[in-house]
Structures are given as structure tokens and as C-alpha cells.
């Protein structure tokens, strides 16, 4: 990146005109899709009848809140993004959107999502969505990410809250089921992101981000990945014997957990650079499949319970 581009990021001027695609990129669409999916599962497993219009409204508000968090995150991390190859093409490092514009965009969407959810659905869900945005933007982005190697561990709480917000939107209360979903995502986050950090450690080191591989080294990170994966597999399987989720979920969680554990062990075992790189990438890719399949199973079980009375 040129000196001119670096200076542009520091002071925030526009280098070229932004288009709709640039503002969509600020929303972090991939992260939004995961948030929508996990929130949808939170809605589906919630008890009772939730009006479809309110359900759609809740999902949209949660999605917009997640997008707002992404925009604010990019506005506050323009300096970091410009130094990392993975993020250098984002709108702010490219000079397509200024930091001030991203901040205004994110703040506007934050207020819109929280107020709409509170007014149209319930204020418990609105308050929890506001807390989720605050936690991600202030606690994680401004503090944890820049100052501690445990940034992903603690900060993972923000990414784990959407299904809880959805459940509260549907019921107006809290229960063990959404808390179990929270714990699954919370303990899934470290192995997922540390696998990424292992093969992107040079990027993080260059940007001065204290990710675990940068601070503690790859060996310590591999051990932490394995330990968190063991906890994840145990926590994900627990709802079945505890009677919260059905046997189909239990079998799927054990099968997926075996796969997750296998890839984590491979990451722990393989230290040679080329083999380690492949193992890290495989764990990262499988972890996405793991979470999707696990939550999809819950969603399918919930849908089956809904339509069963209509069939029989």
C-alpha cells in the first residue's frame, strides 16, 4: 500500500467514490449470514406461537444490528485493516468510505435496529441487542482486540448472543435452551478463529494485534485449540442427556464432535510448516460446517415438531 493510501486512512478522506457495494461490505455480510442463521434457530426452538411478522422483524433487526456492529468495527479498525492482507481491500483502507461515514452509518443502523426491535417486539430483546452491539464495538473492538491475547475468548460472547436475543424476542424471557446455544458458540469461537490466526499470524503480527499465536506462539495455540475443542464437544453433547434437545441432535452432535476433535488433534500433532498450514485450514473449514450442521439439526427438529400435528 502506498504512503498516500496510508495517510488517507490516518486522516480519513475519500480517495474514490463509494457505491452500494462498499456500504454492503461495511456490514460484513458473511458475519451477518451467520448471525441470521443462529438467530433463526433461536426463534425456531423457542416455545409457543410467535407471529410470523414479528419473527421476520426480529430477524431483520438482529441482522441490521450485526451489520451496524460490523460497520463500527471497520470504522474503528481502519488502521489495523490497512496493514493486513486479509482486510486491506475493505472500503476504508481502499479510501472508498471515510471513517466518519462508516461511524455515522453504523450508529444510525444501531439506533434503528434497537429501537425497532424494542418498539415492535419487546424491550427486553431491544436492550439485549443494544448490549450485544456495545460489547462487540466497545469491549471487543476498542479494548480486547488490541490489548489481550484472550480477545477472541472474551469477545466471542458478542457473537454468541444473537440466538439469545432471538429467543428473548419470541418469549420475553430467558431459559436454559438459548443459554446452551450461547455456550456452544462461545466455546466454538476460539478453535475457529485461532485456526485462522495460525495461518494468518504474520498478518496479525504486522498489524500489532496480540492474537494468541503472536503472543504465546503456535505450540501454545495448538494446545489451547485442542482444550477448547474438548470443552466444545462436551458442551454441545450435554443438552441431549439433560433432556433439552432430542436424540437426533445428540447423535449428530457426537458425530460432528468426533470430526471437530479429529481436526483439532491434527492441528496439535502436525508441526512441520506445510503440514501445519493444511491442518489449520482444514480445522477452520470444518469448524464452519460443524456449527452450521449442529444448528441446522436443531432447526430441522423444531420444524418437524411444528408440522407433525398437521400430518398426523
Swiss-Prot record:
State the Gene Ontology BP annotations: heme O biosynthetic process
Q: Name one Pfam family in it.
A: UbiA
Q: What is its EC number?
A: 2.5.1.141
GO MF terms listed in the record are: protoheme IX farnesyltransferase activity
Give the bilayer topology.
Answer: Multi-pass membrane protein
Q: Which reaction does it catalyse?
A: heme b + (2E,6E)-farnesyl diphosphate + H2O = Fe(II)-heme o + diphosphate
PROSITE patterns attached to this UniProt entry: UBIA
Q: Name one GO cellular component term.
A: plasma membrane
Q: Where in the cell is it found?
A: Cell inner membrane
Keywords of the record: Cell inner membrane, Cell membrane, Heme biosynthesis, Membrane, Transferase, Transmembrane, Transmembrane helix
Q: Where are the transmembrane segments?
A: 34-54, 56-76, 119-139, 152-172, 179-199, 225-245, 248-268, 283-303
So what does this one do?
Converts heme B (protoheme IX) to heme O by substitution of the vinyl group on carbon 2 of heme B porphyrin ring with a hydroxyethyl farnesyl side group.
Family to which this protein belongs: Belongs to the UbiA prenyltransferase family. Protoheme IX farnesyltransferase subfamily.
Q: Give the miscellaneous note.
A: Carbon 2 of the heme B porphyrin ring is defined according to the Fischer nomenclature.
Question: How is this protein named in the record?
Answer: Protoheme IX farnesyltransferase
Species for this entry: Bradyrhizobium sp. (strain BTAi1 / ATCC BAA-1182)
Gene this chain is encoded by = ctaB
